[in-house]
Every structure is written in structure tokens, then in C-alpha cells.
Amino acid sequence: MQLRDALEQLLNKHDLTAEQMEWVMQMLMSGQATSAQIAAILVALRAKGETVEEITAAASVMRSLATQVTLTDKTHMVDTCGTGGDGANTFNISTASAFVAAAAGAKVAKHGSRSVSSQSGSADLLEKAGVNLNLTPEQVAECVETVGVGFMYAPAHHSAMKHVIGVRKEIGVRTLFNILGPLTNPAQAPAQVLGVYDSSLLMPFAQVLRELGSKHVMIVHAQDGLDEISIASLTDVAELKEGVITQWTIDPSEYDADHPDLSELKIDSAQDSLNIIHAVLANDHSAAADIVCLNAGASIYVSGVVSTYAEGVQMAKNVIANGQARTLFNQFVEKTQSFA
């Protein structure tokens, strides 16, 4: 098979088999495809619409090429990483939630990078807080095991991405790689809360993660467009638990966390985001604190620390109120600095 054959097939709106897709991905990720070929394949895939089988095959290739973070004990381990691209410019909700979930007993292997489409990516924010991002996989594992949170800076773990990064920037449209990021956690966390930018991705993501072996996952998209669980609208959920996918809805008013809009969550910089997170962890009872609890609650739930989502939300409120989340945030910063 040539890349030209794959391209012809996609242009004729024919899906690729798992084997074909794996071959195509190997070509793209190994530097054997030219920039023009990479762009053509990515655009043709998006125009056709990526299938669950194609996404699963692509994700498994990316996982196999990633620099792994090896954790022997995966009890209560969870990843929080969304697709981004919701255009809402809110503070780093899933990053803040990671520390709250960890304070509640989850082990968070967070995977993220610098901003692509927002004012502040998780890496931008953590750097502002004084976190050392240049850790070896062993040091990341040590953070997860001792503090409860580890941050994997995506470019350091996905070096094969260097072959496609230039093309992604040049074409500037959403492609398969926006979808793959959250599916390729280098620590292979068995549980995950994953926010998506469109409700059409809820079921496909749940199906892909089932194929990839995830145990308990919540894929979320809020009806106001947010790729997080929202305080200003209902949030649609596709939940994968032990092989079964169920769809349900989260209503913030049921958790005393509903607000008229998202205006209090908007930011212009990583510093703004950090200021909001410090206030939340200082127990400021704000709209920001409410959205952190709704999202951390999901991580606490899928990690297996509690048995219902409602218990997860309550536990998130507790560890913020008693200062445990704030203490853990500071411990994490210090731990990463100790490796410098």
C-alpha cells in the first residue's frame, strides 16, 4: 500500500481498516511522509469523518510510540485531559480539579501541554505556579506515588509528534490529532474524565476507550459548549463502566452549584488562571470553586474512591474546605522543584 492509495480511498469516502490506519499512522509518525502527504491525509480523514476503528488504531500506534510512565499500582489512578478547543477561555478547570481529586485519594496522572487554542494550557499554568515540567518518566511516577499527582508534559512523551506538529500549525484546522491527545495518556490510566468540544464525540470516545481497555470513564460535554462539566447548563455524559456505556445528564442545580453564566471563569492569561485556582483552594466559595467540585467529583468517582458521582462532588467540597487540596498543590510544586 502507498499513502496515495490510502488517500484515494479516503477521498472516495471509504473507511480505512484498522490495519490500514495503523500503517498510515506509522508512516506519519516516523517521518516517512512529506508535509503535503500528512496534510492531505489529515484533511481527508476529517472530511470523511473518522470512525471509531480508525481512531482506535491511530491511538494504539501513538501509545506504542510514547515514552511511557510506568506505575506498578494503578489503584484509583485517573487522567483528566480534554480535547480543548471549546473556545470558552475559562481558567484551567481540569488542572485545578486534578489537585482536588488527588487530595480525596485519587492518583492523578495528568497529561497536557501548552496552549493551542486557549489563553492558558495546563503546562503554562503549572509553570506560572513554579512547577518544574522537565521531569523524567521515573520522576513523574514518583510524583504520582508520593504526592498523588504527576504531570506529563505531552511533547516530552510524544517525541514522534515532531513529524506532524509543523503541518498541524500550518493548516490550522482541527484534525485527528486533536482527538488523539486525550486518548494517549503515557501512564495508561485505567480511569479517565475527558471533556470533548462537541456532543457528537461522546459515544465515539467512550467506544474507543472501551476498545483500548479503559475500565471507568466519563466523557463529558456541556450544553453551553464547555468541554468540562458546567455550572451554567446541563452536561451530557457518556459513561463507560466495566464494558457498558450509559448516557446520562448532570444538572448543576442538584449539587447546589448552578450559576447563570460562565463570566466569572473567564481569563486572559495563565496568571489569571493561577489567581483563580489559589482563591478556589483557599475556600472562596465562588462559581470557580463550584465548577472545580463538579469536575473533581467525576475524577474521584471514576477512580473508584467513592461509588457515586454525588459522593465524589461532596468529597471534593470537603477536601477544599479542610485545606487538604491546597496543601497537596503546594506539596506537588515542591516535589517537582526537588528534581531540578
Swiss-Prot record:
GO terms for cellular component: cytosol. It catalyses: N-(5-phospho-beta-D-ribosyl)anthranilate + diphosphate = 5-phospho-alpha-D-ribose 1-diphosphate + anthranilate. Its EC number is 2.4.2.18. Pfam families: Glycos_trans_3N, Glycos_transf_3. Pathway: Amino-acid biosynthesis; L-tryptophan biosynthesis; L-tryptophan from chorismate: step 2/5. Keywords: Amino-acid biosynthesis, Aromatic amino acid biosynthesis, Glycosyltransferase, Magnesium, Metal-binding, Transferase, Tryptophan biosynthesis. Mg(2+) 2 binds at D227, E228. Anthranilate 1 binds at G82. Homodimer. This is Anthranilate phosphoribosyltransferase. It comes from Hydrogenovibrio crunogenus (strain DSM 25203 / XCL-2) (Thiomicrospira crunogena).
